[in-house]
């Protein structure tokens, strides 16, 4: 069972930020406006909150849930790099996938198997629920699809990076 002191400060920050980064990158996979972005971010936060509630018996989740400090965000230039908007969004998604892989590898090394499985599942669920939170490609709420092909592709990439089958 893993507690906060099982991790370095940077490792703990990574574990805490990874779900938010996944939600943001899911939104970036197929951007569709401010209201959709807000819905997708809120859906990701809801998944994290639910994971904390349903995994209270796991020390890692109990520690994550009780840490109310505000972690430092990565430098945007590190996540986005240079280039066109499309290039920056692609770099952002790739940077997030690298962090997902690092976070899940870290939990696999330092936490119990149950904690690692629950953490992996949480990250995959964040991507799925964020993508499902608003329609893509419609007009004023009419038409469109719930999860776009681009979002579905990113969900698959998150699952692969997290080791979720």
Please report, for each region that a protein language model flagged, where it lies by residue.
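Small-residue-enriched hydrophobic alpha-helices in membranes
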Residues: 1-165
